[in-house]
């Protein structure tokens, strides 16, 4: 009986270690802009922890950057609900890619307002906002 518990514990520990390695690898790929390669790991992580805002952001950005704005949308909305930094920027881009310009404009404006409150540069977001308006 004790052997079963030990095996179960070791298997669980191994799974956590593999998951951590996969996350670290996926984040490294993401940071390098290798979104297609990082996407499967983030997809698995979102399935196991759908409430994790960062996982939703990373997976959503991977989808957006690989030409899947519709798939990205729900994950980016989830990230924004959980107040993940930069989530609004990518959500606005997804709205824009889906021709939902009013929502894109509103989201960019909210993002710019948040940046100003934190005394951060708004230049990139303002350029994207103007692009959505035209």
Functional labels for PLM-detected ranges:
Residues 21-44, 48:
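Alpha-helical segment of the N-proximal tetratricopeptide repeat
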Residues 31-32, 65-66, 97, 130-134:
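Register position in tetratricopeptide repeats
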Residues 58, 90, 124-128:
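Canonical tetratricopeptide repeat
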């Amino acid at each position: 009986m004790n052997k079963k518990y030990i095996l179960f514990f070791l298997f669980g520990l191994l799974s956590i270690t593999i998951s951590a390695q996969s996350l670290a690898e996926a984040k490294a790929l993401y940071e390098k802009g290798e979104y297609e390669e990082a996407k499967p790991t983030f997809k698995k992580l979102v399935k196991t922890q759908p409430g994790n805002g960062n996982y939703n952001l990373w997976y959503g950005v991977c989808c957006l950057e690989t030409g899947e704005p519709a798939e990205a949308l729900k994950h980016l909305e989830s990230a924004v609900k959980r107040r993940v930094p930069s989530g609004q920027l990518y959500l606005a881009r997804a709205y824009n890619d889906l021709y939902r310009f009013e929502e894109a404009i509103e989201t960019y404006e909210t993002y710019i307002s948040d940046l100003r409150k934190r005394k951060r540069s708004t230049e990139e977001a303002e350029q994207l906002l103007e692009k959505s308006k035209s």
